[in-house]
Amino acid sequence: MRECISVHVGQAGVQIGNACWELFCLEHGIQADGTFGTQASKINDDDSFTTFFSETGNGKHVPRAVMVDLEPTVVDEVRAGTYRQLFHPEQLITGKEDAANNYARGHYTVGKESIDLVLDRIRKLTDACSGLQGFLIFHSFGGGTGSGFTSLLMERLSLDYGKKSKLEFAIYPAPQVSTAVVEPYNSILTTHTTLEHSDCAFMVDNEAIYDICRRNLDIERPTYTNLNRLISQIVSSITASLRFDGALNVDLTEFQTNLVPYPRIHFPLVTYAPIISAEKAYHEQLSVAEITSSCFEPNSQMVKCDPRHGKYMACCMLYRGDVVPKDVNVAIAAIKTKRTIQFVDWCPTGFKVGINYQPPTVVPGGDLAKVQRAVCMLSNTTAIAEAWARLDHKFDLMYAKRAFVHWYVGEGMEEGEFSEAREDLAALEKDYEEVGTDSFEEENEGEEF
């Protein structure tokens, strides 16, 4: 089997983990204590779900996951929560002191103490796999554990499991709302350190999700639970093809092959449709054409940026539910004609489609309506460079005054790492710019020399 191991790091990673495993359990008919419910045999017509769950001798299903935080409170909620019996106690790892929003604490001082234990637990999980295909790593860019510890973990996973894929689900600091002043520092340091270790990183921007909750779901004051349930739907759509049989089965490496044209350009933009509340869904016919079209609306995106200003390099449409290839082809043809979608000239075809016949599941009492079909679009577009530019600008404002830098240096970091990381991100912005320029322009330039 092609198993995937999920690693949830820091508060954001663990809380998203809660939402995701709650949803996965519902989708596979697994109850809170890990046993199969009455519907399970109907849903899991084969054993594809074992990519995410392992089965014990007495019929319990245990997530192939590890939750790590350098301070105990968030993971303690899992230990005492509804799904406390789902996880093996050793899968929930906590330290005693937190990283205090400081990358250097997560990566050097505090993180160093936990890393071997975490790798040891991950090793136990990988030993139980017959054909490990890779890791899914959930974390935030802004927190100390999410940024520092994750980048340390990624480095070590690369050492221990060289060729295995590592996909990240990363929470990008929102342009307006911020949970920590030093988010830009942490984000840029972690991006620099993990850039060469991550194969593909799906970024989710808190503010974009706040807006979706307000606009599409009519939630006036969205809580983290609202945000995480929405994020878990996206994670579920991306991983559905690994957990269910479909007409087009995508494994982790297939994502990279289709979405990542150059190793560094591995930040696809995620869009999901339909995001709609139950009251509205009742009055709308969400046809394949409609949901496909709404994927190209900037306000269904998980990161604030405008694809109309950028060019697409690749585009993956992952449909689930009552969808047939004919409808999809018609919908995509319509979009190609009417939308202002610009592909880079060196990548003419552009659309890859996956269809999964398992309809989307919703958490009972959640915000999303139960729909017959949904689509998740992963597109690699040069527009996402806007997100980096925003972050770099904030970094520059603080770093020009060397504000807060002493906290990092005090934890054993060198100031040179800041400028090194910043240069790497400047190079990343440049890479995006170059990828978007047309190839025939470059040919003409070459003749002058």
Swiss-Prot record:
Expressed at highest levels in the testis, followed by skeletal and heart muscle. Expressed at low levels in the developing brain. Keywords: Cytoplasm, Cytoskeleton, GTP-binding, Hydrolase, Magnesium, Metal-binding, Microtubule, Nucleotide-binding. A motif (MREC motif) lies at residues 1-4. CDD domains: alpha_tubulin (cd02186). It is an enzyme of class 3 (hydrolase). GO terms for molecular function: GTP binding; hydrolase activity; metal ion binding; structural constituent of cytoskeleton. The keyword Hydrolase applies. Mg(2+) binds at residue 71. SUPFAM superfamilies: Tubulin C-terminal domain-like (SSF55307), Tubulin nucleotide-binding domain-like (SSF52490). The keyword Transmembrane does not apply. It is found in: Cytoplasm, Cytoskeleton. The active site is at residue 254. GO terms for biological process: microtubule cytoskeleton organization; spermatid development; spermatogenesis. It comes from the Eukaryota. GO terms for cellular component: acrosomal vesicle; cytoplasm; microtubule. Its cofactor is Mg(2+). Coiled coil: none annotated. Its EC number is 3.6.5.-. The MREC motif may be critical for tubulin autoregulation. Tubulin is the major constituent of microtubules, a cylinder consisting of laterally associated linear protofilaments composed of alpha- and beta-tubulin heterodimers. Microtubules grow by the addition of GTP-tubulin dimers to the microtubule end, where a stabilizing cap forms. Below the cap, tubulin dimers are in GDP-bound state, owing to GTPase activity of alpha-tubulin. Belongs to the tubulin family. This tubulin does not have a C-terminal tyrosine; however, its C-terminal phenylalanine residue can be cleaved. Dimer of alpha and beta chains. A typical microtubule is a hollow water-filled tube with an outer diameter of 25 nm and an inner diameter of 15 nM. Alpha-beta heterodimers associate head-to-tail to form protofilaments running lengthwise along the microtubule wall with the beta-tubulin subunit facing the microtubule plus end conferring a structural polarity. Microtubules usually have 13 protofilaments but different protofilament numbers can be found in some organisms and specialized cells. This is Tubulin alpha-8 chain. It comes from Mus musculus (Mouse).
